[in-house]
Design a protein with these regions (language model features):
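Active-site glycine-rich loops that stabilize anionic/oxyanionic intermediates
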Residues: 26-29, 36-41, 103
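The serine-hydrolase catalytic nucleophile loop
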Residues: 38-50
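Conserved alpha/beta-hydrolase
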Residues: 52-72
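Conserved acidic catalytic loop of the alpha/beta-hydrolase fold
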Residues: 80-97
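Conserved hydrolase catalytic core segment
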Residues: 96-139
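Alpha/beta-hydrolase
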Residues: 143-230
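Short beta-strand/loop motif that positions the catalytic acidic residue
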Residues: 235, 241-243, 247
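Catalytic active-site module of serine/aspartate enzymes centered on a nucleophile-bearing elbow/loop
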Residues: 264-301
């Protein structure tokens, strides 16, 4: 079965909401939950399907709140996202698991790791959005980052118009959408998105993510702009951050603030890489999570 043949799945949560997800890799393998960026969907991580199948990893990709098949709660409190992931892991029969988040999915991964301490084996943050408000970084941000992360969240109508327009572009003029996506990006990101296979996967994930409308991006931007509401120091699992030195999409200072607040967190800087580096190096994160989880279980490769 290739990545495009992996079936969509749905879970009815205790409060009646639907949670959509896919399981890539080896479904009976070691569980790794990976949370997509902003916007995005369960399809975003499909490029790691073959790598995870080879490792024996069950790569569990949920749609986050308001994206794809997943309905958002009426009151979106970041720490409460851990309850949804606990329900998903219970449904799939996994007592313990690894968690990862890319870009806008990173705060949600942090919430899961901080709130489900006894269940999380390891946590990975890929090109992450960091705790901008907690770290008091607003005044030091670039103009573009200040607008995206502190100003835009105050205007949900503008967010709706922007993401509706972007989805229209994805569907009608995908080349223009790809150029828009990387208008401020590092040259290496522009080279990646110019590849037909990467563009198809990334834009397809965005299109699916916005199928329910723009509630997902509205929630994300609101969460990014305010304190996260939990103590990152509660994370006890091995943690690692990867960030490209040429990444222009997320504030680098917030990435380091995230790592500094998590005990013993390792930072891997990739000097020549941009925001999308994991697309081209899709084995790095699953291999690390797999190795850490096996070590925690006392298993040798």
């Amino acid at each position: 079965m290739n990545a495009d043949q992996v079936p969509d799945q749905r879970l009815r949560l205790p409060d009646g909401r639907t949670l959509g997800f896919c399981v890539y890799g080896e479904p009976a393998g070691m569980p790794v939950v990976f949370l997509h960026g902003t916007p995005g969907s369960r399809y975003q991580i499909a490029f790691a399907h073959e790598v995870c199948r080879g490792l024996g990893v069950a790569l569990i990709a949920p749609d986050r709140w308001g994206y794809g098949l997943s309905e958002a709660p009426s009151d979106a409190i970041l720490g409460a996202y851990a309850d949804d992931m606990a329900a998903l892991m219970d449904h799939l029969g996994h007592a313990r698991f690894c968690i990862g988040g890319v870009s806008g999915g990173a705060p949600y991964a942090a919430a899961v790791a901080a709130c489900l301490v006894s269940r999380v084996l390891a946590v990975a943050f890929v090109s992450p959005v960091g705790p901008i408000a907690d770290a008091g970084l607003g005044p030091s941000l670039s103009l573009a980052h200040r607008f995206n992360f502190t100003v835009l969240p105050r205007y949900p109508g503008v967010v709706t118009a922007a993401f509706r327009g972007f989805r229209w572009s994805v569907r009608r003029t995908p080349r223009m959408a790809a150029r828009l996506l990387t208008s401020r990006a590092a040259p290496i990101d522009k080279q990646l998105i110019a590849r037909a296979d990467v563009s198809r996967r990334v834009l397809g994930s965005f299109d699916e993510g916005l199928r329910l409308g723009t509630r997902g991006p509205q929630i994300d931007l609101s969460i990014f702009s305010r304190p996260w509401g939990f103590d990152l120091a509660r994370i006890s699992a091995p943690a690692r951050v990867w960030i490209g030195g040429a990444d222009r999409d997320v504030p680098i200072a917030a990435v380091h603030a995230l790592a500094a607040r998590i005990p013993h967190c390792v930072v891997t800087e990739l000097p020549e890489e941009g925001h999308l580096w994991v697309v081209a190096h899709n084995a790095d994160v699953p291999e690390w999570l797999h190795a850490v989880a096996r070590a925690s279980a006392g298993l040798a490769d």
